[in-house]
Amino acid sequence: MATVELRSDTFTLPTDSMRRAMAAAEVGDDVWEEDPTVNRLQDLAAEMVGKEASLFVPSGSMGNLCAVLTHTRPGDEAIVEVDSHIYTHEVASGALVGGVQMRPLDTPDGRLDPAQVGVAIREPDIHNPRTGLLCLENTHNLKGGTCLNPRQTEALAEVAHRAGLPVHLDGARIFNAAVALGLDVRELTRPADSVMFCLSKGLSAPVGSMLAGPHAFVERARRMRKMLGGGMRQAGVLAAAGICALTENVDRLADDHANALELARGLQGVPAIAVDLGRVETNMVYAHCLPPLTRERFVALCLERGIKVDASGPGTVRMVTHRNVSRQDIAYAVKAIGEALRAEALAAV
């Protein structure tokens, strides 16, 4: 039986060139800033996203937390989208470690509105927390992999900067957004004061993310990384794979997007689920289960056929395409899911 891994693009495996680069990596001690491969990766990442410097961190969650801690002070409030990864999937780390309260704003598609952000910025009243940061997410995971375009990002950053707020961009999948929009990634990162992006999702590196911004910001973030236990020694072994990810795997993200669209189209008309084609902008497909089908039953039916999907939100299942999912895998998934749900519908009659 086929096995099709659609739970997340974090399941990507390193490429052969990554494994060779890791084995041959020139290394030093990165806490002393003397690992030449880490330094090359940091220079490359900063140049690619149009920032002065960047920092290699073990995970995107740590990168986001380093940014929050660097931009804010205890007692501040950060404006976030209600379903953003920073707010929903990072264990309240900003509050726990940094004393930073999150102010979530609801949106239909993950795209904050500038007027909405303007209203959320606190007045300078002694009773209020100080609004200290605006966080954006591009692509937006829980809203289906939707993209912020440059105009939208600039408008949001303008509102924040006018009020003296820095802007942090959680760009875990920012290269997916750039490829989907047909843009240089710097057009999407330019308005933000800092940006985090992952190497270990669609770009297929085994470990790591990058946090980029001005030199002074990155130096302060380096201290936060050390405090959080993220200072690594001979990290060039990992950074070597990151260099391969950025030089070899960006353009091929278009294949993942095409496969996601193929999957979404194939699931149109399948009973008991609804897929919004308009939300399939990058490499994610969200299927909404229609009663009496539950997401748990959908996941189980898929697993019986070797297809692994993610029980995401209430009544919702997420499917994510990536380098290790082929067009043949998509065809199999469409056929198997369709047959399973049609049989389920007949059994319920």
Where are these regions (language model features)?
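Conserved PLP-enzyme active-site core in the AAT-like
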Residues: 1-290, 296-305, 309-325, 329-349
